[in-house]
Amino acid sequence: MIDKQKLYKAMDGLGYRESLKGTDFIRQAAVIMAADRRAMMTKDVYPAIARAAGTSPARVERAMRAATGAAMRSPGWGEAWRELGGWDHPTNAELCARLARECDDEN
């Protein structure tokens, strides 16, 4: 189970803005991936979020990339991301999996 407060704090520290839909989609994806470590982004995660949001999986993926792009332009992204053990530009799957691991209650 994921600690949602920890997830919100981690994403805030990385510079994600609440005003972007992709930020919420990333949170939802991290929760899905924490519940099922074998969930695949294109087959499981994007379609599940798209159904809940009433949109297409492609738009979910694009919104997540846009939110990450905006966060990467914020001050402190590099340092905060490296603290999570990442490198310069994560894919959506890498980001969500790392957030799921970092914010898991069992950690």
Where are these regions (language model features)?
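Basic, alpha-helical nucleic-acid-binding regions used in initiation and control of genome expression
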Residues: 3-12, 20-24, 28-29, 36-107
